[in-house]
Amino acid sequence: MSSRSRFDQAFKYARVIPFNDTDKFILFSDCHRGDNSGADDFANNRNTYFHALQQYYKNGFTYCELGDGDELWENLHFSTLYESHQNVYELMRKFYLENRLHLVWGNHDMIYKNPSQVKKNLHSHFDRRTGEERPLFPGIEVHEALILKHEQTGQELFLCHGHQADWMNYVGWRFNRFMVRVLWRPLQGAGISDPTSPAKNYLELIKVERRTKKWIVERNNQFTITGHTHRPRFPEPGDIAYFNDGSCVHPRSITGLEIENGFISLIKWQIATTDDGVLKIVRVLLEGPQKLIDYKTN
C-alpha cells in the first residue's frame, strides 16, 4: 500500500467532528509521555505542558492529540506512564468527561489501532491505593484520523499523525519498536539519535513532508494537519495547505496549533524569566492568526 493509499484510507474512515466559529481547539502531538526516567523526553516539558493544558481546559478548548501521545515503544505498559504522569492523565480525563478530548494514534502508540488495547489500557487503570480498577477514559475510542467539518462553510480540516507517509513507521512499526527497545533506548543516554525517527533524521523528514504535500495537492489542496516529524509548519494562504503542530518534546518548549473564532495560529509555550528573576510559563504566538476560510479550495 502506497502513502497515497494510506492517506486515502485514513481520510475515508476519519471521525467527522462538526464545528463552527464559536468552537475552540488546541492541537498537540508527539508528547511521548514516558516513565520519567532519563529516556523520557516528555519529562523535561511536563510542567510546561501541564500548565498550558490547564489554561486550555479553563478557557473551554477541545483537546485533539494527534498521535504519539504515549511512548509505548520504549515502555511496555501504560500503567508505567500513568504512574509517572498521573496529574497529566487526570487533567486529560477532565477534558474527556466533558466530551472535549479526541485521540489519534501514531506510530509510537499504534497499539491503539486495536480497540481491545484501547480498552485494556485507557478505559480504566489500577489504583494502587484502593487495590481496585478505577475508570480513566471509559468507552474512549482512538482514531486514525479526524475531520473537523465547518457547519457553515463545509470546509474540512483533515487531522492525522502523519506517519501514513512513512512506510517504515506505518507498515514496519513493529520492527522499529523492537529496535528502539533493545538498541536505541539504551544508546539514547549516550546522545546517539534514533535514525528510524524522521524527527532525528533530516533526510527522512524531508521525504515524509514531500509525500504528504504530494497527497494534499492531489486532493485539491486538502487542508491537512499532522505531527510525526516534530517540525512545525504553517503555510501562507495559496501555498500547499500542510500544517504541522510540532511536538511537546522540543528542548525548551512545546508547540501546537490553536483554532479559535475561525482562525488558526501556531503557538509555543516556554519558560521565560522576568526582569526580577522570576521564572514563569508563557504562551508565544509564532504564526497567525490566519482565517481558516483563506485556505478553502472546494
Predicted regions and their residues:
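Extended recognition/assembly regions associated with phosphoester-bond processing machinery
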Residues: M1-E65, G69-N298
